[in-house]
Each structure stands twice: as structure tokens, then as C-alpha cells.
Amino acid sequence: MHSSALLCYLVFLAGVGASRDRGTQSENSCTHFPTSLPHMLHELRAAFSRVKTFFQMKDQLDNMLLNGSLLEDFKGYLGCQALSEMIQFYLEEVMPQAENHGPDIKEHVNSLGEKLKTLRVRLRRCHRFLPCENKSKAVEQVKSAFSKLQEKGVYKAMSEFDIFINYIEAYMTTKMKN
């Protein structure tokens, strides 16, 4: 009986130690996040470069989907929410449609989506960068314009993904200065 109690106690202590290590890892990853951000943005840009030409050639529209009002939201007090909503918009609405353009495109868009998900996880883990609740009107305008473009919306949104990366960079630069 004593040996089973001792075993349970040792398992408990091991669990406590492991959870402490995870907490330290999470804190360390947040400490190093500002220095790893340029690398993450570089990876996003590299992944996008594999599909950029395809989607920009298909985008025959002159108007911009991602405009200055969205950038202003990214730089202002709604930056957190705008970033969060735009990541969700690309992951849930744009990229699933973008994947429907052949196996090569699907593979590259999927890779791009995974990198964007990784960024989102890191941002959420470090509450300093994504502590938000309010809605962004600029994001709602982007979503509305995207819907109105119907099948052309995916070309427009994907062709402007590099602008989105630039907006992420602008938001993160602002947050790191604060």
C-alpha cells in the first residue's frame, strides 16, 4: 500500500515539474518572440512567394481589398482585434477557397496557412501582443468587399497577402515599442 502511495506521489511531482517547465518555456518564448518575429514574417513571405504570381495573375481587379483604413486599425487601438480577425478571415474564408486551384497551389497555400496558424498561436500565447475584444470596422469592410467579389474575391485576397504581412509587421512593431 505504501509503495502505491509513493508511486502516486512521484507521478504527481513529475507532473508538477513538467507543468512548471512548460510555463517557463511559454514565458521564455514570449521573451524571445520580438526577436523571432522577423524570422516568422520572412517565412510567411517566402511561403507566399510560391503562390503570389499565380494569384496576382488571376486578380484582374483594380481596386484594393486591403486598404489604408485597415492599416490604420492595425496601428491604432483596434490593432489587436484587426489582426486577430484578419488572421481568422484568411484561415477560414480565403485559404480554403484558394486551395481549390490544383494540387500544387493547395500544397503551398496549406503551408502558408500552417505558418499563419503558428504565428496566431505564438501571438495568443503572449497576451501582450493579442489581448483584444473589440471589433474592427475596417475588417468588416474587407470581409464585405470580399463577399461581393464572389469567386474573384479569393484572387484579390490572396494577391494582397503580402500587404497583410506588412500590416502584421506594422502592428507588431507598434506593440514592441509600447
From Swiss-Prot:
Primary site of residence: secreted
Protein name: Interleukin-10
Purpose: Major immune regulatory cytokine that acts on many cells of the immune system where it has profound anti-inflammatory functions, limiting excessive tissue disruption caused by inflammation. Mechanistically, IL10 binds to its heterotetrameric receptor comprising IL10RA and IL10RB leading to JAK1 and STAT2-mediated phosphorylation of STAT3. In turn, STAT3 translocates to the nucleus where it drives expression of anti-inflammatory mediators.
Domain of life where this protein originates: Eukaryota
This protein's record includes keyword Heme: no
Record keywords: Cytokine, Disulfide bond, Glycoprotein, Secreted, Signal
Protein encoded by which gene: IL10
Nuclease keyword on record: no
Glycosylation sites: 67, 134
Oligomer status and interactors: Homodimer. Interacts with IL10RA and IL10RB.
GO biological process entries: immune response; interleukin-10-mediated signaling pathway; negative regulation of B cell proliferation; negative regulation of cytokine production involved in immune response; negative regulation of inflammatory response; negative regulation of interleukin-6 production; negative regulation of membrane protein ectodomain proteolysis; positive regulation of B cell apoptotic process
Compartment annotation: Secreted
Family indicated by similarity: Belongs to the IL-10 family.
Record-annotated disulphide pairs: 30-126, 80-132
Lineage of origin: Eukaryota, Metazoa, Chordata, Craniata, Vertebrata
